Amino acid sequence: MEPANLSNLRGSSLRGSTRGSLRANSNSIWRNNGVEIFSRSSRDEDDEEALKWAALEKLPTFDRLRKGLLFGSQGAAAEVDINDLGFQERKNLLERLVKVADEDNEKFLLKLKNRIDRVGIDLPTIEVRYEHLNIDADAYVGSRSLPTFMNFMTNFVETLLNSLHILSSRKRQLTILKDISGIIKPCRMTLLLGPPSSGKTTLLLALAGKLDPALKVTGKVSYNGHELHEFVPQRTAAYISQHDLHIGEMTVRETLEFSARCQGVGSRFEMLAELSRREKAANIKPDADIDIYMKAAATEGQEANVVTDYVLKILGLDICADTMVGDDMIRGISGGQKKRVTTGEMLVGPSKALFMDEISTGLDSSTTYSIVNSLRQSVQILKGTAVISLLQPAPETYNLFDDIILLSDGYIVYQGPRDDVLEFFESMGFKCPQRKGVADFLQEVTSKKDQQQYWSKRNEPYRFITSKEFAEAYQSFHVGRKLGDELATPFDKTKCHPAALTNEKYGIGKKELLKVCTERELLLMKRNSFVYMFKFSQLTIMALITMTLFFRTEMPRDTTDDGGIYAGALFFVVIMIMFNGMSELAMTIFKLPVFYKQRDLLFFPSWAYAIPSWILKIPVTLVEVGLWVILTYYVIGFDPNITRFLKQFLLLIVVNQMASGMFRFIGAVGRTMGVASTFGSFALLLQFALGGFVLSRDDVKSWWIWGYWISPMMYSVNSILVNEFDGKKWNHIVPGGNETLGSTVVKSRGFFPEAYWYWIGVGALVGFTVVFNFCYSLALAYLNPFDKPQAVLPEDGENAENGEVSSQITSTDGGDSISESQNNKKGMVLPFEPHSITFDDVVYSVDMPQEMKEQGAGEDRLVLLKGVSGAFRPGVLTALMGVSGAGKTTLMDVLAGRKTGGYIDGEIKISGYPKKQETFARISGYCEQNDIHSPYVTVYESLVYSAWLRLPQDVDEKTRKMFVDEVMELVELGPLRSALVGLPGVNGLSTEQRKRLTIAVELVANPSIIFMDEPTSGLDARAAAIVMRTVRNTVDTGRTVVCTIHQPSIDIFEAFDELFLMKRGGQEIYVGPLGRHSCHLIKYFESNPGVAKIKEGYNPATWMLEVTASAQEMMLGIDFTEVYKNSDLYRRNKALISELGVPRPGSKDLHFETQYSQSFWTQCVACLWKQHWSYWRNPAYTAVRFIFTTFIALIFGTMFWDLGTKVSKSQDLLNAMGSMYAAVLFLGVQNASSVQPVVAIERTVFYRERAAGMYSAIPYAFGQVSIEIPYIFVQSVFYGIIVYAMIGFEWDVGKFFWYLFIMFFTLLYFTFYGMMGVAVTPNQNVASIVAAFFYGVWNLFSGFIIPRPRMPVWWRWYYWANPVAWTLYGLVASQFGDIQTKLSDNETVEQFLRRYFGFKHDFLGVVAAVLTAYVFMFAFTFAFAIKAFNFQRR
């Protein structure tokens, strides 16, 4: 049959449905002998099934594709509608099709292919070509790339001048990919290999059509001869990122289902219609299960899809399908499972080409093998196209690939069949050793440090061959020549299948997109119900405080002053309802990374995401506002008319919706918390200051009046005031006037008293709501995330590859080392004392978790280590291994004294003396698995800091620096000396460089014993080799080193001298030497009857974990713990423990005069030194704060211009106080909230450094608190001088210094309050929520909204406990408290302040003392909390 032309499919399938129904004698269908019929158990069943099938065949095409025959558990077939398949039915169907993923997947895919082939339908294929591809980026190099305060300012000005073409850019061009060409063929698996920063991710992004527009690209990429602009590449191909970005509140199944619904079914439906038509014409009856599967896979819009279930199964995610994905805040699935969810998210779609970036990070080798194998089957059988980059592929995974692309330094060193790659390198003089994985060899052979060990031409001297030379040699190699010939012949476009390339931008229709996004938003709101409940309760508490503060019995309505108090209450109501929308800011930003990923993958347009997040919040608003109005309205004593009650309710609903829309918009524009909260503060400040309450309209300057008219707050406040003061209770005439009291009050504040202003306000707010939400949608559509990973390049003088060739990693018992490390020849600058560590019968248990008790666990304690014994000696490298949950990290934490809870029994000795944690911390180092370092210091500074605090006091600075230099050489960190550490995954060092820094930070402490937790996890083969070489060099200096290790390659595993193997449940099953090529280990396990022999060339580490698995133990009926306990090895180890457990003659127990190696003062100086660099190089915090302060100062200065000189009426004083009130609140809250993320990041570093015995908590707190003082001082002076001069306060030295003093201490206590918030809570999110609540209370009791004399007696005590009230008291009393000028009503300024606010000038001394006390109180609380609370759980 001719290949199907799928463009005519829909037409042909519908024509088929109108032809006559099946003939009555439909049995003739089954008499076609050439067709394979899947027979059932009995003839009768067959006949019944045939009748049902015949009935199905009579249906019109569209209905026929929606129905199928499903077999029940008894084997009877029933007709089902595809859309009505239940969970159990889908599960049973998959059980029949793919019972065991590894075994049955291929059979299932072949059945699918068989059905398609039988009627001669051709599957679409994609061939991807890239020709002469060059990709360049612009970057700052050397010290200019460090984000110091000065660089930030210089780069900012420079970028501005560049855009105006005044100055040329100082950025250097960096070439990522250099003139590369190649072909990715369908039906073949391509493996992309290359060392870090060789351009793998960039190549994959280029092939998938997802490159960053800022990059300069020349050359072309084409699919089946069509260039990327001729179709939609993002939907034709799927790019799977190496970053796992998911919404933590969704389960694994929900994540995949959402993705499947958004991506749609592609051309599956058309293909099925054509298939069905041809089968009908040829009298072919398909397998019923395959038929149902294909129909379900081709049905759009199903919430629960068979394809999703299938992908979950082959990725091994079916066991955690209903578990939350989780994130930093929510406990969820493991890292390896998250990686698989990222892969599954794209596999559920209809893409024919897959570009997968490092999909195996965090997975064990057997899982990686089974996933890659499933992908291979799918690619080869269903004619897909795949390029997969892997970090450390095991030999068996490597062998699954057909083609290899090897990238190095932006050049393609080799591209072609896997079988020819070794031949190419042998022709260049490099040979892969026998016990070396080919993939590992390929990653190392182009690296300057690793190349020499593979040189095989013994008769020629070795010279380093660059990536460029390899790339040139490849062109003349036979594989390269063949590729060149193929590229010379263009792809024949006429052979491109019409269904191969996608032209629609989205997978489903607009209505369906909106439905899918709405359902997800609803689900997330349910999952986040805690946030909404928390907001409700916070609002309830504030409502209770507000109504008891403005209690009706305490609120007369006789004078304009009384009206002013009511106006204050209404103003506060508007503020509360507006600021309650602020949580939208954080929630929007939190979801942005996932949104950007899904938007760029064309899952949905931005409007489909924006509309549900607006519409679904309306019911929340109704509840919040309803709660507030019902609680406060009548208790405060607002106008009792029910219409006015409902009008206030309506107005506040619109206010809340407007605020939520505004915060969403700000979040989408700001994109990070820092920028958004700064922008948010600006927007709020302008609204707040120009809302007509803080500064009366009559006093707004002409150049700011536009701000007054566009401030949503003005409309809100005006409407709510009119609604209240237009009521009956306020319509009596004021004595000596001709206006009602209500009208007078509204006018005195500069508002409009006419009743129609209520509706003007409501209308304006509705308009703002629509505009903000529309702009939110636009911002989502057109803005991209800020943070891009960036590399720090050395300047030309500092060549990155300046290290000489280091030794190969080998174990001490005789590996084939080519050149020994130099460190053996010369001793280190600082001597150290070698120590052994022995532990005998160590038991570790924790209290039984509540969940396990509920499941029926009877014991009180859960035992994690069951009597473990062993000895670690100097100069011996020990690997601590076992399956997940065996207790490797637990044992290490117990030995290192890092556990914060639980019960430890048994004896641990150091060189024969019982271990004391205080002294042990001084001679030991612990390299944690997650590399935690201060992000804003350089590599060299990190090491100097660690050495400064951990080496003894008698080591002078010169020796210390020499020692640091030695360690840097040992760990090969020389070229990165001035590189900034940075935040993981955002900027700074790569994973492998961070690992080496972690090791170096411990080494500079000159420890005798070092523990390392998974030093090679998440690294590629080359990086792992560098880290292991570092570890080996460390052991060769005579130290005791223990590493937990997970899935090592052969050469990493055999670099160890001894193995400590544990099984699940915390018991040891082998403790002893490995031997050459692991001979001792293999001999020990093979001597057990029934244990499978190791295959030639197989990895002993993998084999050992396989043969000791609990399933194997059950099968063989042996317990490896018992086997070990009865072996000679165990007895030998016990003898060794006894021998090392006795102190050597003449030795002394470890003893140090002090707990820390440095004095308290030195600790303080060192902590302050590190904080200094951390702040200086963090412009996102320090520079933004200064810019923000300067802007606010200029805004206030121009807004309240020259108001300080006006003191003719009471409103002037209220305006002046308003300027102080707004400034204090905004600057203070901005300081408090912006310091929190900085402190939160440093706190995690503090936990590691304190555990290492570097310093006590007080010096750390001292450094953190002290470094703020100069920055805040400059901030106060900046602000003070600008504002004082522009507002025109009296130029009196005393008053000016009072102003500066109060501003300085106010900003200090706000900043320390923010720091304290972090110190007393487990994480930054909780800290910001707790802190925010108090800002609201402080605002209410500050004395501006309701002065102290008007507060009810039962609340006055809180006025005195409120720091903001003291600040306002000080600012107003110092400026105006002694002025004798008369106001319009014959009262002096001094008398008015005493009567109305209760402010006295002679009370300033007390104010100063109280403000100072607040600063000390918050700083001390911070220090105490840091010392007392440890929120790290181990």
UniProtKB/Swiss-Prot annotation:
Name the UniProt record assigns to this protein:
Pleiotropic drug resistance protein 1
The UniProt record gives the binding positions of ATP 2 as 882-889
Transmembrane feature ranges:
530-550, 563-583, 618-638, 649-669, 675-695, 702-722, 760-780, 1181-1201, 1221-1241, 1269-1289, 1296-1316, 1326-1346, 1357-1377, 1406-1426
Give the family from UniProt. Answer: Belongs to the ABC transporter superfamily. ABCG family. PDR (TC 3.A.1.205) subfamily.
Q: Which domain of life does the protein's organism represent? A: Eukaryota
Organism, per UniProt? Nicotiana tabacum
* Membrane topology classification: Multi-pass membrane protein
The keyword Amino-acid biosynthesis is annotated on this UniProt entry? no
